[in-house]
Amino acid sequence: MEYFDLLKNEFEKAQAVAESARSKGFDSRAYVEIKPAPDLASRVEGIIGLPGLAEIIKANSAGKTREELAFEMVKQICTSDRFGTAEQKLLLAARVGLAVLTEGIVVAPTEGIQGVALHKNADGSDYVAILYAGPIRGAGGTSAALSVALVDYGRRLLNIGAYKPQQSEIERYVEEIQIYNTVAKLQYNPPEEDLRTILENCPVCVDGLPTEDAELGVHRNIKRLDANGKEEYISNRVRGGVALVICEGIAQKAKSVLKHTKNVGLDWSWLNSIIRIDKLKTSDAGASKDQHFLQELVAGRPILAYPNHSGSFRLRYGRSRYTGIAAKGFNPASMILLGEFIACGTQLKIDKPGKGCVAAPVDTIEGPFVKLESGEALRINTAEQAYAVKDKVRKIISVGDILVTYGDFKKSNTPLQPTSYVEEYWEAQAEKAGLKDAKAENFKEAYEISAKYNIPMHPQFIYEYSDITSQELAKLAEAVRKAKINSSAADLFSIDAIEVENTDGIAEILERLCVPHVEMSRSITISKDHAQALVAELGFSDSGALNMAKDLKIDLQKSALEIVNDNAPFKVMRRSTRIGARIGRPEKAKERLMRPAPNSLFPIGEYGGKERSLFKAYMYEKAKFNNRGIDIEMARYRCEKGKELVAGPYCRKHNSRARVERICVACGRVSESDVCPYCGSKTSSFETRHIDLMKLIDDAISNIKANSIPKNLKGVKGVINRDRIVEPIEKGVLRALHNVHTFKDGTSRFDATDMPITHFYPKEAGVSIEKLAELGYTEDYLHNKLESPDQLVELKHQDIIVNRKGAEFLLKVSQFVDSLLERFYGLKPFYNAKTIDDMIGHLVITLSPHTSAGILNRVIGFTDANVGFAHPYTVSARRRNCDGDEDTMMLLIDALINFSRDYLPTTIGGTMDAPLILTLNVNPS
């Protein structure tokens, strides 16, 4: 069976169980609310919530890029009679277009775009304003900027005029953006002249809701005209969405925006002036980048290496199975000797490329160069060596390699840096010169290859000449000229060691060069290959013969590396390009807990104390006995059969569903509308109700056949969803019995730092060959039959390797779910898991906090690292990279049964971090 079919079959089994449970009617809705979305069109429809939208998208998507499809959807909506007024069409068009651009994953289309309004310019012409809020950040800069272009495209189709701002409005924007940058920090803060260019030329008004407490100080009480020509005031509070769209969108992504607007015939050529200005400023980017690197330092999180500094991390291009999409590789010896501040998954802030990364161990790159207390200076390349010398290190001279992919430079729009001279570069040069599979076991072999094939010296035998001055090189050359040479013959390759007098800073020069040596009180000894290499590179050799009296070509106006190349019998490359790094956040793998952590979304106000303890509230009620009951704000559920008010969506007295009814806040009459038809006042679906808590809990315990109320049972102070819907207490009791906690949407979650992986060893993942075969793994990465736990296997891209604490979390949640199915819903248990090994092969949902589309994943192994390993395709499908952020994991059936939109708050951003839809198949195309 194909991989996707396996996932689909397992999902359908879980979904059938969840639908059976929900059909009992015990939950606020009698159906599973997480909608599976097999493709982009389905995801967009799920996010927007408009039935039939997917079919329109599919009908217009053939042969189009995402950007072209987004503009086409604007055209389809704005030229149709089906979608209401001009304002309604433009709002829907903006949201649908942005949802297409963001692949139907993030909530920015619905939460970040709060509305579209028509206004009048001073000359009486109409214009369009689009209202943004903070969640627009989740769309990314280019998509956020293109949402403005989408509205521009739509307003032209609807023959609505362009925005013509007054000078007072422009100056208000400029002040507002500077204040926002002070209180919230923009990733990109454009010059004021760029802001004025945008504001004077953008044909759509970028408007927004107030998001910050800060207010404008100078340009206050600015007036504008509404759609009817009446004056209205613009809020004096700062609008975060406005700043994000203008600065991190239009200004920062001007080049991309211009390209896409050209493609659809929109004249946004005014962006050229901003792009030209940006190009003129790139020469200053390096200095500002270094300053930015040192901003926001946190006490206790050390700076490991400064940018472009001697001894900092050496840039090495490449990728390992743990790196890419912002994850960087470090030698395990570097991680150990740097005080073990760096672990697998630790976030580091780096000066380039991008801003952050997570650390991954890579044992095939160069480790740190250190000086021991004994005086020996040497390179440490393995974890075993590092642990052996850990307590003997006097100082770390060079911290080793950082492995970076080309894609990280491209994605972050960072100019490529010159590569360090590494073994794979030398091997490529040798192969180009005609020598395949070149190896140099010692300096003599490297010398001979260099001479024969006219290629530079092997990187193992060159040193950091770019880190010393020409004067220091001249001083070192004289010291080597006077050195005592231990040699069996008068040729270069017979040198066993050289002893240099330990005076005048020679030891420090050798350290910065990273030449292995042993420092004694009076002398410094350099042995064998490195002695031969240093003598040759300083110029004391003619065709392999020693000539210590040779006159060297030393021009102090040149760099040390240039002088070496003037004298050495072979070419010596610049060895290192340096990268700065400092510790960011530590790695994380931990159950997500609200504070205090509830087992149930049942409100008890102040009755349970600060811990919101339902047990304490119950015992308090029991002690009062004659005065039972608490007053809490909750929905007015009316039993459909018995017609009496009940505490939840199901009336067990009459075995009937209950529905939420609305009541007038003024006259108290029941109504189905938001406005009372009798007195015109607002109606409400909730009120402060007197609840017999003791009876409610006793009934819940009886319903699930529990012995008594768990002492650790906790609820919440209150619920803030629209109708004040509460969760059945039975679920909370069962969670408490299994020590499981709930999040605000009814799910139980485990958070872990994102970490990429493309290949794994079965022994690493703690999974047997037999179990892997059941999951579809029958070959290693070379297509050999999988027979040994030591074979390297390519990871299927929706499979994940979870932290062991996460596996234990899944185990207890599975046991809770089985109890829930059996004791609350009257169904058969599904998981029947006894150990964490039983969780292998089961499905989970992973989700990023700025999105509302979960990804279906399968557990295939465990790790002791405090991270969540996933294929780069899965991480990217969550609209993430691995720069130190964390995502969450939920057991599939727990989410399908217990998640409800009815629990979500109605505030802006309320649907973020909620699995409204589920991507079943991650299609990397």
Q: Residue ranges of each PLM-predicted region?
A:
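Extended, Lys/Arg-rich, non-catalytic nucleic-acid recognition/anchoring regions
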Residues: 1-837, 841-855, 859-863, 877, ...
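Conserved structured catalytic cores and adjacent interaction surfaces
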Residues: 885
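Short hydrophobic "helix-edge" motifs at membrane interfaces and signal-peptide entry regions
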Residues: 872-875
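Conserved phosphate-coordination/catalytic loops
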Residues: 869
